[in-house]
């Protein structure tokens, strides 16, 4: 049966009806409405949604969960939330380029198990954490270029290490990468790391990257590239490699030394890499430099610890070792037993080569070796460490004596319950306990031989400070001073001796004791003997000085009083100066001496001249003639020696006249009387015989004063001669001469010489 006209129309619609049918199919296929300003294409078997340049601030929630390709480029999305891509198990291609994404929630892509390409370039990502890319087990292409990434965690790529083929991290701020994770990307074809801050590539990173086709390290901070067989494929040498390799490392500050010699030996024609260092190769093309100029310098150790380090066991010690070279040397340390030291709980090697040993042991005694090595060689330097062992505690003997063997050396022993009853307590005796001191006694330690010294340690109940005292081994007592009053003390005595087993000093406790000082403060003590003696000396000296001062003051007062009286008398007598009219001087009979010129005036004025009336002068002449005989007789008996001088009045003179002639009298108290008018007569009186008259001779007493005393071998004062010689004679002659006038007798009316104030002062002082 031939088909009719309608049957052919149902099977194949005419061309004019095709547009209408497409519109019907598109409308029927809309399970969900397409977001506003987005383009949705449902071309079987894929559903594509394109929302580019639509001004989105976040991922639209009305996206069909069956979408296969989603492009949200050139928008203002700031964050990717956990619910944005939930249940999109069919999504294969996700593009979020050129947004402002700075945050990606943990597990935001966990449901995208079928995702193969993820584009997050040109955003504001600062780091890539390990939980952000979790769940992407089928990821092939990861594009993270042109962000602000400074750090990539080592677990960030764990979900797709075996599947990723293209990794782009260009134009970021990366200083390092998890090179260990990169080395495990065995299917990696393209690795783009240009325009970063990478200065180091771990050696052996590209060993397993056999499928790597392109490596871009342009414009980083690489100084060197580690030697790797990967770069041989770029030369085509040897067997034909499965895939060619393109390596770009221009724009890096390459340090052209022997470490890059392997790279220089490769043949390159179109690369323009230049050298930055050393100075003689700066700005020269890497491939044009001869191989002979790629040189290295062996290490040289410039600073190390002293030849010997002395440390006490248990203390820390630091050993320094620094070296220079090209390339920079790496420093290692070898222990005395040959072990290579590294960072551990007890040792640490710093970046500058210093070795720190935090806790030293006796095994550390020996020579540590510092090894500095680089590509050109190595250098070594020994450092000797001497560990001083601490004193060891000697083990207790097998059978210690019950009361003589010392116990443990623990200052806290007296504080334990029952410690006061132990044998250790009974060995020490605290005697003479006061508020500030105590005397400790202990017996001799015969069971402990070789005692060097004793160590006394004590502390107070009020604080935790422990005081140590070292005393000789010969002492068995110790006086502890400067203790606080009213406090309890724990005191132990230890014996320091030589241990024969270890040849090291050891300590054993001799004994411990507890005591409490008196609570009352120390009373005031009397002054010591030497202080008292000094005080007495000062007191006696003060009394003596005060007495001398009082005596001097009294003497000055007396001198001033009598001096004023003498000056007044001198002023009174100076108005009518007297003169001496009858003066007789008995000398040795030398007329030459009498006729000689008068000497210079003596400072002692013996006599004063008094004006005498004429009647009295006549009587005086008779008395003078009478006394001449007696004077001659006495002159013979004296044998020419000088006799005493006296001034006598005449016998015929009355008592009143006698008082007038004698001049100023001196009372027993030493005061001078007024002068008399009677002329004095110089006579020599002996016994009671009358004096015979003789021719009158006048001598000037002042003129003959020098001749009178020249016969003596020592000077004599006229005043003393007149008082001690003339006065007694005058007294003796007074009885016989008192003739008619009792008052004119020599016994009752003595002629007194007038002395000056100076002579009187000398007499008073004596």
From Swiss-Prot:
Residues forming the Ig-like domain are 299-386
Q: Which residue stretches are annotated as topological domain Extracellular?
A: 32-536
Q: Where is the Fibronectin type-III domain?
A: 424-520
Q: Where is the composition biased (Basic residues)?
A: 714-727
- LRR repeat extents: 66-87, 90-111, 114-135, 138-159, 163-184, 187-208, 211-232
Question: Which family, according to the similarity comment?
Answer: Belongs to the LRFN family.
**Single Gene Ontology BP annotation:** regulation of postsynaptic density assembly
Q: Which residues form the LRRCT domain?
A: 252-298
Q: Which gene encodes it?
A: Lrfn1
Transmembrane stretches, start-end: 537-557
Q: Which Pfam families match?
A: fn3, I-set, LRR_8
In the UniProt record, the signal sequence range is 1-31
The free-text domain remark for this protein reads: The PDZ-binding motif is required for neurite outgrowth promotion. This motif is also involved in DLG1-, DLG3- and DLG4-binding.
Q: What is this protein called?
A: Leucine-rich repeat and fibronectin type III domain-containing protein 1
Extract one GO cellular component term from the record: cell surface
């Amino acid at each position: 049966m031939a088909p009719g006209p309608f049957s052919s129309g149902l099977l194949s619609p005419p061309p004019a009806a095709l547009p209408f049918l497409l519109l019907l199919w598109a409308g029927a296929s809309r399970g969900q409405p397409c977001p506003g300003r987005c383009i949705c294409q449902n071309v079987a078997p894929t559903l594509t949604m394109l929302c580019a340049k639509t001004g989105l601030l976040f991922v639209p929630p009305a996206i069909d969960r069956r979408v296969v390709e989603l492009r949200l480029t050139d928008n203002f999305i700031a964050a990717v939330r956990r619910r944005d891509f939930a249940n999109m198990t069919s999504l294969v291609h996700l593009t979020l380029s050129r947004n402002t994404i700075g945050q990606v929630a943990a597990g935001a892509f966990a449901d995208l198990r079928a995702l193969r390409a993820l584009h997050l370039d040109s955003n504001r990502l600062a780091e890539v954490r390990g939980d952000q890319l979790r769940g992407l087990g089928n990821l092939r292409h990861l594009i993270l270029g042109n962000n602000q990434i400074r750090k990539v965690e080592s677990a960030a790529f764990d979900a797709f290490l075996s599947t990723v083929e293209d990794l782009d991290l260009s134009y970021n701020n990366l200083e390092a990468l998890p090179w260990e994770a990169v080395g495990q990307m065995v299917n990696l074809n393209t690795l783009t790391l240009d325009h970063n801050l990478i200065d180091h590539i771990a050696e052996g990173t590209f060993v397993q990257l056999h499928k790597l086709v392109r490596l871009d390290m342009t414009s980083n901070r690489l100084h060197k590239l580690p030697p790797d067989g990967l770069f041989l494929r770029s030369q085509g040498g040897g067997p034909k490699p499965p895939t060619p390799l393109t390596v770009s490392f221009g724009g890096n500050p390459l340090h052209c030394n022997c470490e890059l010699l392997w790279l220089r030996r490769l043949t390159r024609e179109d690369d323009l890499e230049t050298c930055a260092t050393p100075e003689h190769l700066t700005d020269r093309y890497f491939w044009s430099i001869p191989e002979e100029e790629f040189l290295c310098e062996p290490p040289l150790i410039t600073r190390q610890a002293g030849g010997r380090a002395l440390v006490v066991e248990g203390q820390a010690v630091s050993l320094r070792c620094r070296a220079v070279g090209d390339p920079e040397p790496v420093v290692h340390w070898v222990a005395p037993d040959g072990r290579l030291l590294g960072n551990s709980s007890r040792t640490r090697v710093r970046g500058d080569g210093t070795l720190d040993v935090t806790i030293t042991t006796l095994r550390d005694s020996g020579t540590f070796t510092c090894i500095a090595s680089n590509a050109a060689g190595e250098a070594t330097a020994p450092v000797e460490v001497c560990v001083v062992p601490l004193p060891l505690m000697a083990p207790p003997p097998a059978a210690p004596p019950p009361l003589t063997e010392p116990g443990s050396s623990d200052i806290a022993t007296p504080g334990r319950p029952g410690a006061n009853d132990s044998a250790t307590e009974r060995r020490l005796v605290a005697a003479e306990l006061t508020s500030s001191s105590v005397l400790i006694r202990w017996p001799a330690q015969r069971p402990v031989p070789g005692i060097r010294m004793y160590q006394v340690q004590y502390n107070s109940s009020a604080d935790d400070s422990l005081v140590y005292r070292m005393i000789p081994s010969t002492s068995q007592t110790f006086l502890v001073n400067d203790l606080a009053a009213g406090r309890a003390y724990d005191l132990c005595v230890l014996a320091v001796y030589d241990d024969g087993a270890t040849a090291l000093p050891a300590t054993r406790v001799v004994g411990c004791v507890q005591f409490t000082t008196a609570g009352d403060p120390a009373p005031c003590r009397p002054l010591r003997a030497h202080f008292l003696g000094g005080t007495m000396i000062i007191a006696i000296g003060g009394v003596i000085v005060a007495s001398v001062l009082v005596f001097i003051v009294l003497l000055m007062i007396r001198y001033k009083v009598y001096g004023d009286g003498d000056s007044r008398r001198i002023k009174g007598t100076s108005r009518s100066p007297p003169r001496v009219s009858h003066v007789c001087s008995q000398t040795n009979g030398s007329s030459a001496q009498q006729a000689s010129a008068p000497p210079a005036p003596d400072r002692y004025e013996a006599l004063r001249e008094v004006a005498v009336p004429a009647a009295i002068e006549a009587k005086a002449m008779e008395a003078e003639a009478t006394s001449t005989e007696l004077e001659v007789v006495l002159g013979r008996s004296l044998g020419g020696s000088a006799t005493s001088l006296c001034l006598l009045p005449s016998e015929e003179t009355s008592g009143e006249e006698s008082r007038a002639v004698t001049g100023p009298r001196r009372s027993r108290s030493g005061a001078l009387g007024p002068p008399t008018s009677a002329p004095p007569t110089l006579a020599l009186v002996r016994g009671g015989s009358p004096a015979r008259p003789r021719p009158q001779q006048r001598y000037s007493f002042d003129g003959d004063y020098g001749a009178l005393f020249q016969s003596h071998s020592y000077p004599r004062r006229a005043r003393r001669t007149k008082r001690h010689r003339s006065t007694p004679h005058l007294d003796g002659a007074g009885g016989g001469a008192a003739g008619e006038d009792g008052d004119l007798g020599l016994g009752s009316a003595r002629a007194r010489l007038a002395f000056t104030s100076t002579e009187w002062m000398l007499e008073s002082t004596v």
